[in-house]
């Protein structure tokens, strides 16, 4: 049921379609997380990496369902800060949550920008600071262009990311034929060391699933 404290009107333009928002959400989940972290998770969990991803996906799934429920009850662009305000009605708590989101977003953006340098230098050998500056300015211009335009660009990039993952699956298609006979190898033994490795891998793998929480921040701009 819609909360009576949430106003029906909004000053933001509702220009985003459901397909655009869906692609935007997929794009924030895919990308740097899934492409970069597979190797990191495998480094921690070894052959048990699929179990780490499975555990992380279950935890992320519960979190995603919580966001879906909250965003339907409180469709505000403030997202997590609005939810905290509705739950506790204490301004400093909602402010702390809001600033935490800003800080986390800044750290994540910086991390991804640093990771981008390695890929960029494959094509053009430039100083790290220059590559990061070009990326930040370019993305800033796209973001300032408008919500519909920027999410359209993000959706196009998402489609490219999905095609990239599908290409990997197709190229490695022959290897999947061996999986049924090797499933037992992916099940961790009842050993503390093995499950510790799985837990460490799951901790990293969770980052590969995050991104869905960004969708709630455009709730007031969806048609």
What are these regions (language model features)?
Residues 33, 99-103, 153-156:
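Hydrophobic alpha-helical segments of secondary membrane carriers
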Residues 40-44, 52, 61-136, 141-144, ...:
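Hydrophobic transmembrane alpha-helices that form the core helical bundles
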Residues 24, 51-55, 96, 153-160:
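Hydrophobic core positions of alpha-helical segments in small-molecule transporters
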